[in-house]
Amino acid sequence: TLHVFELMLTSFIAGIAFGGLWVRKQADRSADPLRLAGWMQIGMGLAALLSLLVYGNAFDWVSWIMGALDRTASGYTLYSLGTAAIAIAIMLPAAFFAGTTLPLFTVTLLRSGHGERAIGQVYAWNTVGSIAGVFVAMHWLIPVLGLKLALITAAFVDMGIGLFLLRREAQNRPQLMRTAFAALGVLLATSLSMTVVQFDPLKMASGVFRTGSTILSDDAQLIFYRDGKTASVSVTQYADARRLIATNGKTDAAINIHGKPASDEPTMALLAALPLAMHASPEEIGVIGF
């Protein structure tokens, strides 16, 4: 978990930094920084949609990496580098475009005569928006729509903001035409993301990061899969009536309905029974495990 967090944070901060570095001179030279911000918003949304394609294929890439490497210390180092490169490819492009927007909005306000106070205002609203975005994504978008549609929705909102800025700043017919073509591109990219990009639940539940295989056994049947606030949970049933509950592909619990109980089944049964013993009619039960 710590390794995943540091990869995510590194990719995001690096993307923001590189985006800010690139736009540093572009913002000063731009005659209309707000219009440039509109193009950056569209670029951010397109990069987010592209990340869906990378993510959907990441499981096969990890399987190939694990199959090509030996189970040694040096092999693990190469595995870590390979998976880090995949994670960076997923997150950094969209973060790059995100890093360009705040400087452009700041320059726009400064040119409009708002003074240095505009810098604090831009970053304050950015903080508020970040908090609101996390709250909406965690408590509504991902649980209700699932990971794929949640990302597509967020990307579409980004691109919609970009199109609004382009239309607002359009001063002549060529700019209006470019905005119209951009709108068509946004609709096409969104449609392709919904129809072409596939998140295969079987691959996501395979635990490829642990097993090196994206394929469950022939007698396995995926009977439940859902993206939650912080993890994706799956339930797999096998021909011998075993059922496995996995979190992000890692099996956390199993039960054999008709056969001999597994060694940890009493522990799992106790975890379910204890809350019921402590409360007559519980409405919500939280289980914390390690």
Task: Give the positions of each predicted feature.
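Alpha-helical transmembrane segments of multi-pass membrane proteins
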Residues: 1-290
